Swiss-Prot record:
Gene3D superfamilies: 3.30.300.30, N-terminal domain of ligase-like. Pfam families: AMP-binding, AMP-binding_C. It comes from Emericella nidulans (strain FGSC A4 / ATCC 38163 / CBS 112.46 / NRRL 194 / M139). SUPFAM superfamilies: Acetyl-CoA synthetase-like (SSF56801). Keywords: Ligase. InterPro entries: AMP-bd_C (IPR025110), AMP-bd_C_sf (IPR045851), AMP-binding_CS (IPR020845), AMP-dep_synth/lig_dom (IPR000873), ANL_N_sf (IPR042099). The lineage of its organism: Eukaryota, Fungi, Dikarya, Ascomycota, Pezizomycotina. PANTHER family: AMP-BINDING DOMAIN-CONTAINING PROTEIN-RELATED, LONG-CHAIN-FATTY-ACID--COA LIGASE. Its EC number is 6.2.1.-. It comes from the Eukaryota. This is Putative acyl-coenzyme A synthetase. AMP binds at L195, L196, Y197, S198, S199, G200, T201, T202, G203, P204, P205, K206. GO terms for molecular function: CoA-ligase activity. Belongs to the ATP-dependent AMP-binding enzyme family.
Length: 554
């Protein structure tokens, strides 16, 4: 069966820049400060200023570098930058020129960036000063001329976009290029404006093509649900203020900081890089009202001994990118003084396809109600719908789903059913009127025919006072080919002392027999994660498989 949202909306007939800068559906005024530097909020830009800078940068990208000259959706510009005030304007300027915004994580090496440059066919690179050398090295490997490597600096009241340390400052340009207004549904659905790379949790990253329709419907429908559900609740009519701390090379940061705040009518205070102590302080300094982040940040808040009243102005907290365990959710809600709702999605669905309406909450692991116009199914291995209460792979269809992977028809064909449903690879179950996420299909541990969720074991181990962080994967069983043994990779909390035997006993005393750590406990310094906070289990699985399985009779 299909699971439907509470209501549908008419598909928006407008392009992204029109939504951000001209449509009354966005709640910003001309004087609204859209983006400000957290360390110095006098360094900021208003909506009116952002529109002007967008048009000027669009002219620069078109006239100086030919972006969009042969039509929209063909020429990519790659950004490799820490968060900064004018990065959203660069994003909009690229789209305004008819180009495609793409981005590489600042954590990548020059060699990794060069692979992404080639795969995306990027023609220009925009880097922050700290990544200038990396961008040049990557460009050289790809044969991109050095004059097509631009450096953007917009923190500390510096406003520069130039070729390295010299040459013309393109931010001083005055000529403008207005963007093309698009109302045709076909063009909105099929014009790629954003090329973001999947997190690579289960394999090499792939370029996910996102259109005007994808980004506009995602941002707009989420806000419309919230607006509809807060009618009659005047205490919820608070200004939108948040701290920009997520990487913008990923959908959570790109959508959540470039687009959503402008539609919601508020301000992003930008941190160039995440630091938990500074983040907590900024949340108080700017009386933050909205927080959307990943479980590692909530984990940092819970572990901090500095939290007092820094989150007293918070009215809405959301978690995404990875499942939030019940234990961590309850601890974080107590610290924040605010309920946390889980949202669920992925790059291929333009971020989250669920959101929690005002006045509702959940602490059962539910992923929040489906967004308007989306459709969801739960299926078995043969793509047959499962019965209510049975686990199944989640399939999606709707305006937020990508058309596919850039220049990768094989991966695109594999990701979709023949009738157009996107196969998420996530396992869920419909229970008590809610969809509950169980785990990634490829990450479930198979122990003697039973499926074990790493997330459940991780959430429990994080309640141990000596555990700072943990990831669980399946290790090979040397005595039973094809069988997997749960193994925990553990980061010990500073100043604590904990043994493998102690953690095994902790799990044994509280979890079912098939969830025991028969694969052992390995202590490491850091859990490998993507820039968006997802555990890179494939790295740990490779480590586990390269070593002999260690079975303990429990």
């Amino acid at each position: 069966m299909q699971y439907l949202p509470e209501k549908d909306y008419e598909l928006p007939r407008l392009d992204l820049l029109t939504l951000l800068f001209e449509s009354q559906l966005s709640l910003t005024t001309e004087s609204t400060i859209l983006h400000a530097e957290a360390a110095d909020p006098t360094n900021h830009i208003t909506k009116a200023q952002a529109r002007t800078i967008t048009k000027r940068l669009a002219h620069v990208f078109r006239s100086e570098f030919g972006i969009g000259a042969d039509g929209p959706g063909k020429d990519a510009v790659m950004c490799i930058s820490a968060n900064q005030v004018l990065l959203p304007a660069v994003f909009c300027g690229i789209i305004g020129a008819g180009g495609v915004y793409t981005a590489a994580s600042t954590a990548l090496t020059a060699s990794e960036v060069s692979k992404q440059l080639r795969q995306s066919r990027s023609k220009v690179i925009v880097a922050c000063p700290e990544n200038r050398a990396k961008a040049r090295d990557a460009a050289r490997e790809c044969g991109i001329p050095p004059d097509r490597v631009l450096v953007l600096e917009s923190m500390g009241h510096r406003r520069l976009l130039c070729q390295g340390n010299f040459g013309r400052n393109y931010l001083q340009a005055t000529a403008e290029l207005d963007w093309e207004r698009i109302a045709d549904i076909d063009a909105l659905e099929n014009t790629t404006i954003c090329l973001l790379y999947s997190s690579g949790t289960t394999g090499p990253p792939k370029g996910v093509m996102l259109s005007h329709m994808n980004l506009v419907s995602e941002a707009l429908f989420t806000q419309l649900v919230l607006r509809d559900s807060k009618e009659g609740k005047p205490h919820l009519n608070v200004p939108y203020r948040t701290v920009g701390h997520l990487p913008t090379a990923h959908i959570a940061g790109c959508l959540g900081c470039f687009i959503t705040p402008a539609v919601a009518g508020g301000t992003v205070y930008w941190m160039p890089r995440f630091n938990i102590d500074e983040f907590i302080d900024y949340c108080k300094k700017y009386a933050v009202t909205f927080l959307s982040t990943a479980p590692p940040v909530y984990h940092g808040i819970v572990r901090s001994d500095r939290v007092t009243d820094q989150f007293k102005t918070l009215v809405r907290a959301e978690s995404g990118a990875a499942p939030l365990s019940l234990e961590l959710q309850e601890q974080a809600e107590k610290m924040l003084g605010c309920t946390i709702s889980q949202r669920w999605g992925m790059t291929e669905s333009t971020g989250s396809v669920t959101t929690m309406p005002w006045g509702q909450s959940d602490n059962t692991g539910g992923i929040s109600p489906l967004l308007p116009n989306m459709r969801l199914r739960l299926v078995d291995e043969r793509m047959r719908d499962v019965r209510s209460g049975d686990e199944g792979e989640i399939l999606l269809k709707g305006p937020m789903i990508t058309k596919g992977y850039f220049e990768n028809p094989e991966a695109t064909a594999e990701a979709f059913t023949t009738d157009g449903w996107y196969k998420t690879g996530d396992i869920g179950v419909y229970k008590d009127g809610k969809i509950i996420m169980v785990d990634r299909k490829k990450e479930l541990i198979k122990y003697k025919g039973l499926q074990v969720s790493p997330v459940e074991i991780e959430g429990f181990l994080l309640t141990h006072p000596g555990v700072a962080d943990v990831a669980v994967v399946g290790a090979r069983d040397p005595e039973a080919p094809g069988n997997e043994l749960p193994r925990a990779y553990v980061v010990i909390k500073a100043g604590s002392s904990v043994s493998e035997a102690e953690l095994k006993e902790y799990v044994k005393s509280n979890l079912a027999g098939h969830k025991q750590l028969r694969g052992g406990v390995v202590f490491i310094d850091e859990i490998p994660k993507s820039a968006s906070g997802k555990i890179l289990r494939r790295i740990l699985r490779d480590q586990a498989r390269s070593s002999a399985g260690r079975e303990a009779k429990l």
